[in-house]
Amino acid sequence: MNGQGCELGHSNGDIISQNQQKGWWTIGLINGQHKYMTAETFGFKLNANGASLKKKQLWTLEPSNTGESIIYLRSHLNKYLSVDQFGNVLCESDERDAGSRFQISISEDGSGRWALKNESRGYFLGGTPDKLVCTAKTPGASEFWTVHLAARPQVNLRSIGRKRFAHLSESQDEIHVDANIPWGEDTLFTLEFRAEEGGRYALHTCNNKYLNANGKLQVVCNEDCLFSAEYHGGHLALRDRQGQYLSPIGSKAVLKSRSSSVTRDELFSLEDSLPQASFIAGLNLRYVSVKQGVDVTANQDEVGENETFQLEYDWSAHRWALRTTQDRYWCLSAGGGIQATGNRRCADALFELIWHGDGSLSFRANNGKFLATKRSGHLFATSESIEEIAKFYFYLINRPILVLKCEQGFVGYRTPGNLKLECNKATYETILVERAQKGLVHLKAHSGKYWRIEGESISVDADAPSDGFFLELREPTRICIRSQQGKYLGATKNGAFKLLDDGTDSATQWEF
């Protein structure tokens, strides 16, 4: 093989930090008046007047090296929050200094809110609609902040103590933390921020249930399913309303609350859930599989682990590597065949994905030719052109639930009573994905209603599957959405959906 270079580990990156350094979190801070701490774009103005979590309300929490609860806060302008010798709160410095060190303490009322004590001054940080202040010797209502994690809500959950990933149990009524690698939809969790319920979090599973503190999954989210987020040396701890922390318990590593103190067993990281997909060959409508050995072959009628492949993007080559559950990569062999033999990502293990207007895609191999399906089902990189034997249909297997976001915000309803969707919301609606034929999917709301195209916009009011869509993977966390009629679902600056005829390059890429 060419270019035996870059081995890839399993760690996908702690996304609570938005892919910054480990232990750096990107957060919003909400005061007692339900307003976000804000760093205005001009004049280094500070206030607590933000209505929702947008760019100006984002803060990077950076750990210090001197204690797990001592942190720094950096604004979206890359300036550090600090308090001067006179008690003025500033955000103008490019560098950390003694006045920019804050100590986190957790409210004792069970709410999980944070108080931020400036280490050099000894006073607590508070906020008003006009400015930030640091004058309180003890924290009151104005000095307690609710923490809104700005990570993508759909994550893999990794235990720091056990060094294993969480997954849905076989019985689908518990979460077990014993997976070596996060494979399949069962390892995907949605960390739901509940602003109206004290800014706590619910852990939502792929089978549409919520984790109760007792370790069981249930359909309805109640008080026992809500947890506050705590920061411990760069890691996350989740505390229930009784003051006990989630951790893996026993030989099955069942995730439940038990301890009232935090050790490594109670700590977690939220990690990127890399896209995992299945492919159907256009020639025989069978799933591509490695079930029968090293040959990559389209010969299966159902999807299992051997028909699911993790797509890992090479940013320098702008191509994809496809990893199997046996930890091997698809690789172009000397004879042009595709075999799952490579344990490294090299040039012959990288493929370009080319999307077509009929919802199919093609793979271009390192030899410049397209993957074609032989009558036996075997894949060979021998096709000079894109014909039926070089077409495949794509399903995003480990996203049975989608959360979509664009530059304007999350996808959600215009108003609670209005079933039209907009894409400029501060909070999101989860979207259920139902697979149909030849890569087509139907999108469904929790109400049981389906997405329907209405003119150039989207309504969620169809009683049965109506309009289908194709999902096109463009980056590890971005997709384009194309209607059956070939138009892309686009986002306008005012937050409205619009079906566009724009080409592939200009289509809206939705973060998922």
UniProtKB/Swiss-Prot annotation:
GO terms for cellular component: actin cytoskeleton; cytoplasm; neuron projection; neuronal cell body. GO terms for biological process: actin cytoskeleton organization; actin filament bundle assembly; antennal morphogenesis; cell migration; chaeta morphogenesis; cuticle pattern formation; dendrite development; epidermal cell differentiation. The keyword Cytoplasm applies. Keywords: Actin-binding, Cytoplasm, Cytoskeleton, Developmental protein, Differentiation, Oogenesis. Coiled coil: none annotated. InterPro entries: Actin-crosslinking, Fascin, Fascin-like_dom, Fascin_metazoans. Interacts with Rab35, with stronger binding to the Rab35-GTP form compared to the Rab35-GDP form. Acts as an actin bundling protein. May have a role in the asymmetric organization and/or movement of cytoplasmic components. It has a role in somatic cells during the formation of adult bristles and hairs, and in the female germline during oogenesis. This is Protein singed. It comes from Drosophila melanogaster. The lineage of its organism: Eukaryota, Metazoa, Ecdysozoa, Arthropoda, Hexapoda. The gene is sn.
